[in-house]
Amino acid sequence: MFFGLMAVSCDKEELLQEQNIKNDSSIAQKQSSMFSYIQSIKINNGVDCENNILVFPSWEKLWDTADKLDEMIDYECDMFDATVPNNITDDDYDALADAVGFDEDNVLRAFENDLAFCSLRRKIERLENDWLEIQGDGEWNTNEDPDNHFIFDETERTLFSANTEVIIGETEAEYVYYKLIDDFNWIEVHNWDLEAIRQISIGVIPINNSNVIVQNIVMDEVPETPVECKKHIKIAKYHVNGSNRIKQKSKVINNSWWGAKKISALTVGYKKKNGKWKRRRTTITAGITGVSGTNNCVLYQKCGIAFEKHKVKERKRRRVKAKIRGHKYKGESLIIGVKPQKAYSYHKQGSINLKLDYYDMQ
């Protein structure tokens, strides 16, 4: 469906090869067969696998790829659901999916395998499975859950290295290495300085190297009086329903420097089976709505111009996501803002039915 997208030009391929030669490093490149503008390579970043970082021509292409992968996931899931009997129970659905090898992460795994790439998604999946193995029935610690990484979204995690790194071709003249520290702090390495990248991978920041830029975006301090509009929100919280449990993940992010602008709601489903908690396929819902769940939410461009949106997904899945990306709006880049009682993060599973005001989230 998405094959044959825009290819990286020969000039860019030659440029990357020339830059590698200048650094006395011959790096093999593997081009994606799913998205021809993406390449995977191996650098000395401490991650031992065939290819440990991806190359995108721009940040915009990276976020476009995340959106397209989400569309592919939805398509594959809908195709499987079309073969499933109506009114099937969650347990029977789970058994049928396992029997035929269906999984909502199959598209992401195919993308990683195609590039022989070990992603952040794969790393967190392994850590989360180990963490869930030791969880009991009491309250879970959100700070210890590997899934509560600052990159909330599994699809986006698929595009970053296990160390939250990526290479972006910002101009025709150079490629830039980025290591994300959190939503608003990162390190850049210019001029393809592989020694600087190696140092950063072991925790040493070469601050006297002109090729290295440390970016620290100072966010506004928490005001003493309430603000009218908020542009940055992030929360993860668990909710229990007998032998089932869900996690609410709600986020508003506006980072103009590397283009992450969106509002999202994710619901993760867990179920206890054979004495162990695991992510399980259950009927779960995630949405970005108005107060009733069926009406539109009201969002704000740069906390000024109001516009309405409504997105709800309900599926038998381990996780369900609703996302509104900040694209161009009336000629300007969309900065999403939320105001009181205008936009709600909607999460449902069984008797758990939550509509939570983004503005009031702590």
PLM feature segments, named:
Residues 6-9:
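C-terminal motif of bacterial Sec signal peptides marking the signal peptidase cleavage site
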Residues 12-233:
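Acidic/polar, low-complexity intrinsically disordered N-terminal segments immediately downstream
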Residues 211-362:
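Mature secreted bioactive peptide module from preproproteins
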